[in-house]
């Protein structure tokens, strides 16, 4: 049986190069196979469990945007139950605080400040639960020893009257992480456009790695809708992933068919869900893939007007080796990279990676 890797290699040889000469129609499956081959070559195969996974592992949903949210497909749609992930807009960095702290430090030390901006979705919905995930860097033994003498973590909120304590309870979390469950009386804090949290942890170490960034998890449900809101919700949603770039692509005015025959930069909206990688590559959910496509015969508008009595002289593309066939390809040095965020443990940690030379900027017959 031919493996998936061999099949991708075969499709890659068939496509030869995304920016090379192609027929009048570039098969979408071949483009997707080329894109998958480029991603696998740059990032390697995804190191993840299967779709089922270990039932004992708590899987966090995709965290791809500040204030972004996703609906639980298992819940009835009319309930509008959702889960939102909030990353801090700003926060204390390791340049501002020491990397290690001792047991005899003063209470003012070990204070981490984070500014959150709850989205309009969260502020317009009813919060049913909220947790703050914070990377302590401490093992379970250190956490137990600290809790036996004094609370390891204290959470405060900055208000007009100064810092105020936030009622929380410590829950179960993965190693070196603390999960603080906010009490119901603290849920109204998420209705403010700006939320400044101060977390005091004298024993915690400061880390500037992206995968240790703290975040808020908020479960929300819709408030009682009005008649107008119910009518708007009845409108079917867009069944495909979209982005602002894809929306601009759909809103472009139609072009002449002849413009697509000559060498030009084509675009294809590709989602990682379509590639089967939405549990591996969590941001962006989709992107616009640009590639070169079309023939290299001179377009009619560029041909010189015929002169009576003079035989026409064929126009040759510039910068070609004599006898070589021109090819629609990307200009050297014009390829752009794509930055993605991946996870290999279901959402507990993230990794920022770069796929080089993926998106074409300029095309020409060379």
Swiss-Prot record:
Q: Name one GO cellular component term.
A: inhibin B complex
Q: Which gene encodes it?
A: Inha
GO MF terms here are: growth factor activity; hormone activity; inhibin binding; protein-containing complex binding
* Major site of localization recorded for this protein: secreted
Q: What is this protein called?
A: Inhibin alpha chain
Q: Which organism is it from?
A: Mus musculus (Mouse)
Q: How is it modified after translation?
A: Proteolytic processing yields a number of bioactive forms, consisting either solely of the mature alpha chain, of the most N-terminal propeptide linked through a disulfide bond to the mature alpha chain, or of the entire proprotein.
Under InterPro entries, the record lists: Cystine-knot_cytokine, Inhibin_asu, TGF-b_C, TGF-beta-rel, TGFb_CS
Q: What happens when the gene is disrupted?
A: Inha deficient mice are viable but are acutely sensitive to development of gonadal sex-cord stromal tumors.
Looking up PANTHER family in the UniProt record yields: INHIBIN ALPHA CHAIN (PTHR11848:SF117), TGF-BETA FAMILY (PTHR11848)
Disulfide linkages recorded for this protein, renumbered to the chain, are 263-328, 292-363, 296-365
Site positions for Cleavage, renumbered to this chain?
63-64, 233-234
On subunit structure and binding partners, the annotation says:
Dimeric, linked by one or more disulfide bonds. Activin B is a dimer of alpha and beta-B. Inhibin A is a dimer of alpha and beta-A. Inhibin B is a dimer of alpha and beta-B. Interacts with TGFBR3L; this interaction regulates female fertility.
Which protein family is it in? Belongs to the TGF-beta family.
Q: Which region is the signal sequence?
A: 1-20
Please tell me whether the keyword Glycoprotein is annotated for this protein: yes
Q: Where in the cell is it found?
A: Secreted
Q: Which residues form the propeptide?
A: 21-63, 64-233
Which keywords does this chain's UniProt record carry?
Answer: Cleavage on pair of basic residues, Disulfide bond, Glycoprotein, Growth factor, Hormone, Secreted, Signal
């Amino acid at each position: 049986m031919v493996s998936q890797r061999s099949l991708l290699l075969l499709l890659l040889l068939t496509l030869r190069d995304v920016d090379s000469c192609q027929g009048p129609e570039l098969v979408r499956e071949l483009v997707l196979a080329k894109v998958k081959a480029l991603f696998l070559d740059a990032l390697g195969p995804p190191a993840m469990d299967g779709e089922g996974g270990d039932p004992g592992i708590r899987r966090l949903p995709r965290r791809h945007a500040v204030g972004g949210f996703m609906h639980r497909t298992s819940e009835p749609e009319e309930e509008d139950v959702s889960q939102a992930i909030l990353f801090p807009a700003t926060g204390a960095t390791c340049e501002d605080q020491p990397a290690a702290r001792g047991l005899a430090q003063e209470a003012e030390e070990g204070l981490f400040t984070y500014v959150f901006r709850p989205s309009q979705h969260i502020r317009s919905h009813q919060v049913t639960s909220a947790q703050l995930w914070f990377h302590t860097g401490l093992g379970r033994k250190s956490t137990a020893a600290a809790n036996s003498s004094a609370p390891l973590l204290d959470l405060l909120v900055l208000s007009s009257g100064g810092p105020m304590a936030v009622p929380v309870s410590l829950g179960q979390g993965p190693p070196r992480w603390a999960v603080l469950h906010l009490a119901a009386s603290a849920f109204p804090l998420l209705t403010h456009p700006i939320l400044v949290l101060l977390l005091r942890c004298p024993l915690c170490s400061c880390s500037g790695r992206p995968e240790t960034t703290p975040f808020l998890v908020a479960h929300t449900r819709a408030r009682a809708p009005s008649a107008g809101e119910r009518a708007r919700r009845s409108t079917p949603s867009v069944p495909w992933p979209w982005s602002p770039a894809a929306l601009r692509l759909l809103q472009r005015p139609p072009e002449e068919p002849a413009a697509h025959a000559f060498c030009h930069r084509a675009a294809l909206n590709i989602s990682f869900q379509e590639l089967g990688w939405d549990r591996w590559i969590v941001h962006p959910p989709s992107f616009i893939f640009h590639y070169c496509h079309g023939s290299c015969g001179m377009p009619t508008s560029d041909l010189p007007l015929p002169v009576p009595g003079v035989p026409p002289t064929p126009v040759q593309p510039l910068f070609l080796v004599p006898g070589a066939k021109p090819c629609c390809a990307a200009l050297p040095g014009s390829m752009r990279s794509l930055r993605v965020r991946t996870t290999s443990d279901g959402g507990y940690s993230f990794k920022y990676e770069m796929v080089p030379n993926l998106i074409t900027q300029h095309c020409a017959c060379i």
